């Protein structure tokens, strides 16, 4: 068209160039907004996509936690079964408590029991382990939904740990800590039932000696069955959590 009008007409058309550019630009811009608007209406909004992503992530998290809990429960069941097959604590015992009253295993039926074997002349390990045991008992006492756990201390040194010595010793830890002692044969029998090793060392010039022995805290359920044990490396918090799980599992299978 410009060629048909000739060069002389071009200056007259120059005044329309801005209008053409502006008009075309506006048209293109409006079309772009129209297309963009159509694209936004066709798909979910940003909030919807974020909500879907959050729900999906929460679902994955819940599934992971459920799988982890199931795996932990399976491990606990396997451990409990292995401990039962070890035949620990299945026999009875006959001892005297720190008040001079006879005690046997049946006296603790219906209670959860934490039991530790040691001796009152122990310089450090026994006091530390008994203090840890008492911490566990106190933490569990602070939870009203949980049953009381009975702490028990059985000596492996009956030669020195008579009733009076046990009474003096246990009062330093917890008012409900029960000390048990007996004759050499009675203590040996109870120790064998729980697979506890102990051996008195040589006496020094003051007739003092150290007793080497197994270091473990035993957990018995209300049926009197050995349920678990905890070595020195286990903290009070770890033991409390383990006992919580055992209590929950025990009550879940009650008729």
UniProtKB/Swiss-Prot annotation:
Disulfide bonds join 122-126. The keyword Magnesium does not apply. GO terms for cellular component: mitochondrial inner membrane; mitochondrion; myofibril. Keywords: Chaperone, Copper, Disulfide bond, Membrane, Metal-binding, Mitochondrion, Mitochondrion inner membrane, Transit peptide, Transmembrane, Transmembrane helix. Cu cation binds at residues 122, 126, 213. It is a single-pass membrane protein. CDD domains: SCO. It comes from the Eukaryota. It holds the Pfam family SCO1-SenC. Residues 42-49 are mitochondrial matrix. Copper metallochaperone essential for the synthesis and maturation of cytochrome c oxidase subunit II (MT-CO2/COX2) by facilitating the incorporation of copper into the Cu(A) site of MT-CO2/COX2. Could also act as a thiol-disulfide oxidoreductase to regulate the redox state of the cysteines in SCO1 during maturation of MT-CO2/COX2. Belongs to the SCO1/2 family. This is Protein SCO2 homolog, mitochondrial. It comes from Mus musculus. The gene is Sco2.
């Amino acid at each position: 068209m410009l060629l048909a009008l000739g060069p002389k007409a071009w200056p007259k058309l120059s005044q329309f160039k801005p209008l053409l550019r502006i008009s075309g630009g506006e048209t293109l811009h409006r079309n772009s907004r129209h297309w963009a608007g159509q694209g936004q209406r066709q798909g979910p909004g940003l909030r919807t996509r974020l909500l879907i992503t959050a729900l999906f992530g929460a679902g994955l998290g819940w599934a992971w936690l459920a799988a982890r809990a199931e795996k932990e429960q399976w491990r606990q069941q396997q451990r409990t079964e292995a401990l039962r097959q070890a035949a620990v604590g299945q026999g009875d015992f006959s001892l005297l408590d720190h008040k001079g009253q006879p005690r046997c295993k049946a006296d603790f039926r219906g209670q959860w029991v934490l039991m530790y074997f040691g001796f009152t002349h122990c310089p450090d390990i026994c006091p530390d382990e008994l203090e840890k045991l008492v911490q566990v008992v106190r933490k569990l006492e602070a939870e009203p939904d949980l049953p009381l756990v009975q702490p028990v201390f059985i000596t492996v040194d009956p030669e020195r740990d008579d009733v009076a010595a046990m009474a003096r010793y246990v009062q330093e830890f917890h008012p409900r800590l029960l000390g048990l002692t007996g004759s050499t044969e009675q203590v040996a029998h109870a120790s064998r039932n729980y697979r506890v090793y102990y051996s008195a060392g040589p006496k020094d010039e003051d007739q003092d000696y150290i007793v080497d022995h197994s270091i473990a805290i035993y957990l018995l359920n209300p049926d009197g069955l050995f349920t678990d044990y905890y070595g020195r490396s286990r903290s009070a918090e770890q033991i409390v959590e383990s006992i919580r799980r055992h209590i929950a599992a025990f009550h879940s299978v009650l008729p």
